Amino acid sequence: MTTATANKVKAPKKGFKLDRQMIPTLAAVVIFILMIIMGQALFGTYIRLGFISSLFIDHAYLIILAVAMTLPILTGGIDLSVGAIVAITAVVGLKLANAGVPAFLVMIIMLLIGAVFGLLAGTLIEEFNMQPFIATLSTMFLARGLASIISTDSLTFPQGNDFSFISNVIKIIDNPKISNDLSFNVGVIIALVVVVFGYVFLHHTRTGRTIYAIGGSRSSAELMGLPVKRTQYIIYLTSATLAALASIVYTANIGSAKNTVGVGWELDAVASVVIGGTIITGGFGYVLGSVLGSLVRSILDPLTSDFGVPAEWTTIVIGLMILVFVVLQRAVMAVGGDKK
């Protein structure tokens, strides 16, 4: 090799290379940190053990819903029924609890109801070739209607019910300052278990890899011999069952519910997933990103409350954030040459 030729050979570049698709997730990290800093600077309560504890305890159900919504969105689909499934399972669960049915059996029934709606959605999508939007819109109205038929009253758990163990607060650090303890409850533990399950399921199982493949190109996944139809059933079955689990955590924490509970929660879940960096057209995303997105969504509630802003403005902010993150995703994909 001549000296001239040798000079043309460039050494491989070293150092960290940022994946463009990670930009929306990193943006969510920055936004979350800025929101915490702003809240602390203006109100002095956001970098406190009590605030962090409340954030997780009060929004454990949203973390579960975010994981649930990640699955269909990764395939380019969506599950609009999760909020309505929360309603139907909450109403049925409270009715059964007040009738004296053991708590463990009530929870099993609630999960089975969610699974039935997920199975129905999967059937509509795979056997009747419905778009996920239409299929889950149908199951959303069905679940919401059934919840209203069963009861329109505000239902509460009976005294001494066995659901209370989910909401019982466990202190990790007993801070002498008022409302500044580091604590959690079983609902938070359930949410964290769901996050771990979602991570392992998506990144360390064949079904998880198939989900990403479907999001990339369903036709290509089918040509590769992947079990696309079975995977679609699993996706919507899992999503709906997790929605029922979110209902258990929420109703146990609040102690009551009615047929209108969960209205708009499907949009909160979608917002969490999109803000967390999952591509809305499918094929790329992380469960941990969705969890981060749910925390960004959750912190909006105390922020708007502390600013004295009407609750309606929270919805506007969420809508704008979804718009910004979808545009950011499209821009990143365009730069990367992805025409999907």
Swiss-Prot record:
Pfam families: BPD_transp_2
Recorded GO CC terms: plasma membrane
Protein name listed in UniProt: Fructose import permease protein FruG
Assembly, per entry: The complex is composed of an ATP-binding protein (FruK), two transmembrane proteins (FruF and FruG) and a solute-binding protein (FruE).
Membrane topology classification: Multi-pass membrane protein
Species for this entry: Bifidobacterium longum (strain NCC 2705)
Keyword annotations from UniProtKB, A to Z: Cell membrane, Membrane, Sugar transport, Transmembrane, Transmembrane helix, Transport
UniProt key word Cell cycle: no
TM region(s), chain numbering: 23-43, 49-69, 73-93, 101-121, 130-150, 182-202, 234-254, 273-293, 307-327
Function text: Part of the high-affinity ABC transporter complex FruEKFG involved in fructose uptake. Can also transport ribose and xylose, with lower affinity. Probably responsible for the translocation of the substrate across the membrane.
Major localization class: membrane
Superkingdom of source: Bacteria
